[in-house]
Amino acid sequence: MRVAVSVDLDAIACYYRIHGLGEPPDELDHVILERALPRAAALFAARDIAVTWFVVGKDIDGSLAGPGRDQRVANGQRLAELATRGDELGNHSYSHFYELARLDPVTIDREIATCDRVLAKLVKVVKGFRAPGYDVSPAMLDSLARHGYRYDSSIFPAPGYYAAKAAVMAGLAAAGRPSGAVLTDPRALAAPPEPYRPAMTSPWRRGQAPLVELPIAVTPWTRVPAIGTTLLVAPT
C-alpha cells in the first residue's frame, strides 16, 4: 500500500486563534519553522520517508521588510534544503485565513498566487495546495486550475471530526473565547475518501476537473480521520 505523508506548517498564531487565545507572544512567531520543523524532518529522514510540507507563504517571505525578516529568510532556507533532499513543498495559502473558502474570488486567487510566487523562489514547480481549515470552494479550484496545480488536498470527509469540532467551537463561544476556526462545507462530509477528479462547481463530487483531489485520510467505513490530532488522543 502506498501512503502519502503531509504536514501543515501552521504558525503558533493559528492555534491561538482557533482556541480563542488572542495573539501569541512575539517570541513564538517562528517557533514551528525554527524548532518543530527540523525535529520533524529529522524523524522522517531517519525512516527514509519523503514528506509534503504545506507552507504558509508569509512565514517564509523574505521580501517583507520589518521585524522577523531574517527569520523568514532562514525559514525559507530550511525548506529549500528539505526540497533538495526530496521532500515536496505545497501551497497552504499566503496568509492562512481560516475563512478563505468564503472570501471573494479575487482574494482567493491572490492568496494562492502570492504563496505560489514565494515558493517558486525555493522550488521549480509547486504542484499541490491545501486550504486552511480543510475548506475548499469552487473559486479555489478555479484558481488552482488556472495556475496549473496538479492536485488539491483539502476535502476532509470525516463526519465525526466535524461534529467534535462544532462542539468545541460552541464550548469556546459559551466560555467567551470564540474560535477563529470555521466549519467546512457539510457537503464535503460525504465526499469520496479516495483520490478523485472533482467537479469544478462542486469540489466534494466527482467530475472532470483538470486536477486531482487527494482527500485527508480517513479510515474505511467509520471515516475516523488519520491526522495528528487523532493520533494524540488515541489510546497508546
Q: Which residues are covered by each model-predicted region?
A:
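Active-site-adjacent pocket scaffolds in enzyme catalytic domains
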Residues: 131-236
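Short, hinge-like loop/turn segments at secondary-structure boundaries
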Residues: 23, 80-83, 107-109, 145-147, ...
